[in-house]
Curated annotation (Swiss-Prot):
Task of the protein: As a component of IFT complex A (IFT-A), a complex required for retrograde ciliary transport and entry into cilia of G protein-coupled receptors (GPCRs), it is involved in ciliogenesis. Involved in retrograde ciliary transport along microtubules from the ciliary tip to the base.
Region (Disordered): 1-100
Protein name in UniProt: Intraflagellar transport protein 43 homolog
Taxonomic source organism: Canis lupus familiaris
Residues found modified as N-acetylmethionine: M1
Gene: IFT43
Cystine connections: none
Length: 209
């Protein structure tokens, strides 16, 4: 009952307040108030109660962290893009200024130049000098130590029988193939004739008197 009395009082107040107003706005406001009051009265009479409003959704824990990380990731990506854009502008500006770009030579060219400038050093090989006959004769004449071998073998008998150099040494002569062939063939024929004659006369008598 009290609710009905309150509703009646509200209607009266609404009528008193809306009475002096004229125009479209006043009519719209009065219509809204009446609809609101009629809906309220119908809900009270039927016994239905309007559901309570839903509380606002609260986010916390992992949701907040994910939001923060997403925001921080966006900021980091934006900063990286800005830095790359600045570097590109600086590189373009440096190229426009006409700066000298260093030229790096190829490795093959460098190696070829080094090999061309290098000079091969002569090989250092120790060669034992071969003694000539003259050196041997001089050593035998001057040094008595060479007359004995290992301090035990006496070489005096051998040195006495040695022929002089001019008898043993031969002159260097260029050989002619035809001449050499004729000399060798004549020597062989002479030896063959001598053998044939010895076979015919086994007593050793000369074949020609």
């Amino acid at each position: 009952m009290e609710d009905l009395l309150d509703l009646g009082g509200e209607r009266r107040r609404g009528s008193t307040t809306s009475g002096p107003r004229m125009g479209r706005r006043a009519q719209q406001e009065s219509a809204q108030v009446e609809n609101h009051l009629s809906g309220k009265n119908s809900s009270i009479l039927t016994g239905e109660v309007a559901p309570p409003p839903k509380p606002p959704r609260r986010q916390g824990g992992w949701a907040d962290d994910s939001m923060k990380t997403s925001k921080s990731g966006r900021r980091a990506s934006e900063e990286v893009e800005e830095g790359s854009h600045r570097l590109r502008q600086q590189s373009f500006g440096g190229s426009d200024d006409g700066g000298d770009i260093p030229v790096i030579p190829d490795l093959e060219d460098v190696q070829e130049e080094d090999f061309a400038l290098q000079v091969a050093a002569p090989p250092s090989i120790q060669v034992n000098r071969v003694m000539t006959y003259r050196d041997l004769d001089n050593d035998l004449m001057k040094y008595a130590a060479f007359q004995t071998l290992d301090g035990e073998i006496d070489l005096k008998l051998l040195t006495k029988v040695l022929a002089p150099e001019h008898e043993v040494r031969e002159d260097d002569v260029n050989w002619d193939w035809d001449r050499l062939y004729t000399e060798v063939s004549s020597e062989l024929l002479s030896e063959w004739d001598l053998l044939q004659s010895e076979k015919e006369d086994p007593m050793g008598q000369p074949a020609h008197t």
